[in-house]
Curated annotation (Swiss-Prot):
Name of the protein in its database record: Light-independent protochlorophyllide reductase subunit B
MF annotations from Gene Ontology: 4 iron, 4 sulfur cluster binding; ATP binding; metal ion binding; oxidoreductase activity, acting on iron-sulfur proteins as donors; oxidoreductase activity, acting on the CH-CH group of donors, iron-sulfur protein as acceptor
Active site: D292 (proton donor)
NCBIfam families registered for this protein in UniProt: DPOR_BchB, PRK02910.1-3
Quaternary structure (record): Protochlorophyllide reductase is composed of three subunits; BchL, BchN and BchB. Forms a heterotetramer of two BchB and two BchN subunits.
Organism of origin: Pelodictyon phaeoclathratiforme (strain DSM 5477 / BU-1)
Similarity field: Belongs to the ChlB/BchB/BchZ family.
Cofactor(s) for this UniProt protein: [4Fe-4S] cluster
Reactions the enzyme catalyzes: chlorophyllide a + oxidized 2[4Fe-4S]-[ferredoxin] + 2 ADP + 2 phosphate = protochlorophyllide a + reduced 2[4Fe-4S]-[ferredoxin] + 2 ATP + 2 H2O
Length: 535
């Protein structure tokens, strides 16, 4: 086990509670030591919903262990008395695994009807957030889905939308809008907002939509095997993928409708999918061909995240914005083979598979891309490196749980992603222009006072002192041990380089100087390095 700080995936409890907290009438009881109910704070801080998380803790204490008693039966009774849930999910902890407690036996001692209890038996040492969430959703579907009459008109289930999902509500709204445009009803969304009765109705739909590789795809596979329900697994992220997704959706539903004698669904004019119903559904195809965006064809991008968003963003950046992909990776080893297959021909090297954020930060430091699409961890790393970064998947922070409409799915989502790519790369230029030319009197003017330097220098000069040219020429900036020395004039030239590529230029210049045998970087060395690197 590693110390649980800055991990890409949460614990098994995190995944379990994401599913149960999404549902109506479902409560989680976590059998664990005091303090392990920290997860409730995560939902109240990030989810921005009026409901309090449906999670209680059955405390495992040393005194109870010494006496040979357990609090789990009484906790289950209290939950039943206070909340009256339709289902109680009992989640094991590392402590219960070490103690080898029989949770089924303890639950039976509560006196509650066993059909109201689900002991989700997994190994909390080996199973992490996404696998636990996907497994629990599948277990619930297996337990409650029952044969149903198909709906009279085309309908679909939306699977895998869970609490704390990335841009969850906006993505749902985007998909609902596209389905409504096609005249397709939503039978059930699960687990988000679903009740136990909703799970029973799942087989009534004509088709299952499971756009997330991490959560929901296994449940869709079970429904395909048990109830012969077709499924659509692709994520509609980007303009071309959304068009392909719509065509596949219509094809699958028309095949099911032909067996029932229902009139086929016809793809409408594309402007029917736009927000105003008049214009093109997305501005990305036009925007990508503007002079402003064509400069992106020379920009280098690095993508790291979960399976679904890594694949989608790599394809979007290269195929629709024309950016160069210098590398990509995922922290989900169990989905790495699928990611490799999907990105065949897109990557210049091997797919990076790691769950250590330090490794990813080192790759970013070595490559210094123009844009990083990653997680909250990459956002932190890129701030230290002055590299533009946009968060595209979990883990996230409050900035990615917005009240407004910012989907990643559909045509609307393509516009949102393109805007974020553009702003992430371009806003740095504004700061550089202000650094270079000053604030142009936008705030105040102090002609007598020079602006403070962004970077410390070794030479200290009093306000009225004027060092001689010889002293200025000899003054150098003393770098950290093991780094090259820079003359004042070379440092001044370096500061004219935009801040968002300054570190890369410094690093490349020092590499050139070492290879050339120079002991100090002067203006001449700096210019030679620039010429050799094609600057």
């Amino acid at each position: 086990m590693r110390l649980a700080f800055w991990l890409y995936e949460g614990t098994a409890l995190h995944g379990i509670s994401r599913v149960t907290n999404s549902m109506k009438g479902v409560h989680t009881v976590y059998h664990a030591p005091q303090g392990d109910d920290y997860i409730t704070a995560t939902y109240t801080m990030l989810e921005r919903t009026p409901q309090f998380p449906g999670l209680s803790i059955s405390v495992v204490r040393g005194r109870d262990l010494a006496q040979g008693v357990s609090r789990l039966p009484s906790t289950l009774q209290q939950v039943e008395h206070h909340y009256h849930p339709e289902l109680i999910v009992i989640a094991p902890s590392c402590s219960t695994a070490l103690l080898q407690e029989d949770l089924h036996q303890l639950a039976a001692h509560s006196g509650l009807p066993q059909e109201k209890i689900l002991v989700y038996a997994l190994n909390p040492f080996r199973v992490s957030e996404n696998e636990a969430a996907d497994g629990l959703l599948t277990e619930l579907v297996k337990r409650f889905a029952s044969p149903q009459e198909k709906t009279a008109q085309p309908s679909v289930n939306l699977l895998g939308f869970t609490s704390l999902g990335f841009h969850l509500r906006a993505n749902l709204t985007s998909i609902r809008r596209m389905l409504q445009t096609l005249g397709i009803a939503v039978n059930v969304v699960a687990p988000w907002g679903a009740s136990i009765d909703d799970l029973r109705k799942l087989p009534a739909a004509w088709l299952n939509i499971a756009p997330y590789r991490e959560i929901g795809s296994t449940a869709a596979e079970y429904l395909a095997d048990a109830f012969a329900m077709p499924a659509l697994y692709e994520a509609p992220i980007g303009v071309e993928p959304t068009l392909a997704w719509l065509r596949s959706l219509i094809e699958k539903l028309n095949a099911a409708g032909a067996e029932r004698g229902v009139a086929p669904i016809v793809m409408p004019q594309l402007n029917a999918f736009s927000l105003d119903g008049l214009s093109a559904p997305s501005g990305v195809p036009w925007f990508a061909r503007t002079a402003d965006m064509e400069s992106f064809s020379n920009k280098r991008a690095f993508v790291f995240g979960d399976a679904t968003h890594t694949v989608a963003l790599v394809k979007f950046l290269r195929d629709e914005l024309g950016m160069q992909i210098i590398g990509a990776g995922t922290y989900l080893e169990r989905h790495a083979d699928w990611v490799r297959k999907e990105l065949e021909g897109y990557l210049p090297g091997a797919l990076i598979v790691t769950d250590k954020f330090q490794d990813v930060a080192q790759i970013i430091d070595d490559q210094m891309p123009d844009l990083v699409c990653g997680t909250q961890m990459e956002r932190h790393s890129c701030r230290k490196l002055d590299v533009p970064c946009m968060v595209v998947c979990p883990p996230t922070h409050i900035e990615n749980h917005l009240l407004g409409y910012y989907p990643f799915f559909g045509f609307d989502g393509a516009d949102v992603i393109a805007d974020r790519v553009y702003l992430s790369c371009k806003l740095g230029l504004e700061k550089h222009l202000i650094d270079f030319f000053g604030d142009a009197g936008l705030e105040y003017e102090e002609p007598e006072v020079s602006a403070p330097s962004e970077e410390p220098v070794a030479l200290s000069v009093a306000p009225n002192d004027h060092p001689s040219p010889e002293a200025a020429a000899e003054a150098v900036v003393i770098a950290e041990e093991g780094e090259m020395k820079w003359s004042d004039e070379a440092e001044t030239m370096l500061k004219k380089v935009p801040f968002f590529v300054r570190k890369k230029v410094r690093k490349n210049t020092e590499t050139f100087a070492r290879a050339s045998g120079a002991s100090m970087i002067s203006v001449d060395v700096f210019r030679q390095a620039k010429e050799s690197l094609g600057g």
